[in-house]
From Swiss-Prot:
Pfam family, one: fn3
Sequence ranges on the Cytoplasmic membrane side: 216-239
Keywords noted in UniProt: Glycoprotein, Membrane, Signal, Transmembrane, Transmembrane helix
Annotated TM spans: 195-215
Encoding gene per record: Lrrn4cl
Membrane topology field: Single-pass type I membrane protein
Glycosylation sites: 132, 174
Protein name: LRRN4 C-terminal-like protein
A cellular component annotation (GO) from this entry: membrane
InterPro entries the record matches: FN3_dom, FN3_sf, Ig-like_fold
Organism: Mus musculus
Source species taxonomy: Eukaryota, Metazoa, Chordata, Craniata, Vertebrata
PROSITE patterns cross-referenced by the UniProt entry: FN3
Extracellular membrane side: 20-194
Length: 239
């Protein structure tokens, strides 16, 4: 009997030493998952360093390829559609050198190349050679002083070319197209040297006329005498 009691006491002690099972709630389970899993924060997309008015600007699609992270490009029209007209900026005139510098911005369309159209008088315009799609600036040389011109920039791709408003007018003098668009009218002023020569010529002519008037005055005076002196002489004789 004593031995059986000892066995029961030993069994009770062994049972008490065994760890009791722990009941986990759903919240405890979720906290454990949060400790093990690292949440990745998504990186914010940035715009590509693309300026459609920048000279020698590569396409935005090329910038996406070479960038360390993906960047965003402005929306463009489809490649199977003709491009929208570019926007021609101010024309910087160099009157003394006889040329002008033009600058434009690319349209929101795929462009393979540009070219310039220059109207000087009635008839067909002068067409430049094709310009690379990265070009945004060009020089117009050989312009004549005092002449009005109409300049248009045209964008082209495989689907066609952009429209040129007002291209069918008769001469730059009658052109009344919009100033904010692909075309612009400008007038080459006379060269500063020409103005100096004209001023010198006018001054010389005035000086010669003044000298001629003085000579003519003295010649008449010597021939007919001074009217004031003749009147004084007649008055003294009468006295």
């Amino acid at each position: 009997m004593l031995g059986s009691l000892s066995l029961l006491w030993l069994a009770a002690m062994t049972t008490s030493l065994v760890s009791q099972p722990q009941i986990l709630t759903l919240e405890d389970y979720q906290e454990g998952e949060e400790d093990d899993v690292t949440v990745a924060t998504p990186s914010l997309a940035v715009r590509c360093d693309y300026d459609r008015c920048r000279h020698l600007q590569v396409s935005c699609q090329e910038l996406q390829k070479v960038g360390p992270v993906a960047c965003l490009c402005p929306g463009l029209s489809r490649e199977d559609q003709q491009p929208e007209p570019p926007r021609l900026g101010e024309v910087q005139i160099m009157a003394e050198e006889g040329y002008a510098v033009v600058h434009w911005c690319a349209p929101f369309s795929p462009v393979s190349h540009y070219w310039l159209l220059l109207w000087e008088s009635n008839g067909a315009p002068q067409k430049s050679a094709p310009l690379n799609a990265t070009v945004r600036r060009a020089e117009l040389k050989g312009l004549k002083p005092g002449v009005a011109y109409v300049l248009c920039v045209v964008a082209a791709n495989d689907a066609g070319e952009s429209n040129v408003p007002g291209a069918e007018v008769e001469g730059p003098e009658n052109w009344t197209g919009p100033s904010f668009g692909p075309c612009r009218k400008f007038i080459m002023p006379p060269k500063p040297v020409t103005l100096v020569y004209a001023a010198v010529g006018v001054g010389t002519a005035l000086a010669l006329l003044s000298c001629a008037a003085l000579v003519w005055h003295f010649c008449l005076r010597e021939r007919w005498g001074c009217p004031r002196r003749q009147g004084m002489a007649q008055a003294s004789e009468a006295l």
